[in-house]
């Protein structure tokens, strides 16, 4: 490839949710993310929502599923925390579908657990070691 690309960052990743209001409540109300955008499009028939951890540079777009597309996936999204024990305990106490235990495989893999939102989309939470 001879042309130089102008890619600067990963700005957002997208997940789908049939019930976007419920997804918004989960990501903002339960996970504590901030709402970055909530706009109608397609002549008001569809809605584009973006949420992110406070101060984070990458947002999660919560989009309606495309016709015939999956409604729940393993998103591949990895969220960092500074206290995995506390977050695992708090999410479990809040009734969030989390792995029963924190996985600890040792160096270089950070401690981690997975959670699933109301739609079944899975995300991974890690506590980086560095």
Question: What are the language-model segments listed below?
Answer:
Residues 1-6, 12-15, 39, 47, ...:
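Vicinal oxygen chelate
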Residues 55-60, 120-123:
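Short, charged/polar, Gly/Pro-enriched secondary-structure boundary elements
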Residues 26, 85-90:
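Short amphipathic alpha-helices within nucleic acid-binding modules
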Residues 42-43, 68-71, 107:
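Short glycine/serine/proline-enriched coil/turn segments at secondary-structure junctions
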Residues 54-58, 68-70, 84-86:
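Short, charged/polar surface micro-motifs in flexible loops or helix N-caps
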Residues 19-20, 82-85:
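Helix N-cap motif at beta-to-alpha junctions
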Residues 14-57:
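Core segments of cupin and vicinal oxygen chelate
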């Amino acid at each position: 490839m001879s042309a130089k690309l102008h890619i600067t960052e990963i700005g957002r990743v997208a997940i789908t949710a049939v019930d976007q209001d419920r997804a918004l409540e989960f990501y903002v109300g339960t996970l504590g993310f901030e709402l970055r955008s909530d706009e109608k499009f397609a002549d008001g028939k569809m809605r584009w929502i973006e949420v992110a951890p406070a101060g984070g540079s990458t947002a999660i777009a919560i989009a309606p599923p495309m016709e015939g597309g999956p409604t729940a996936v393993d998103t591949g999204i990895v969220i960092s925390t500074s206290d995995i024990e506390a977050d695992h305990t708090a999410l479990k106490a809040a009734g969030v579908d989390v792995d029963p235990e924190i996985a600890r495989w040792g160096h270089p893999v950070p401690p981690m657990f997975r959670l699933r939102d109301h739609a079944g989309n899975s995300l991974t939470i890690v506590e980086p070691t560095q």
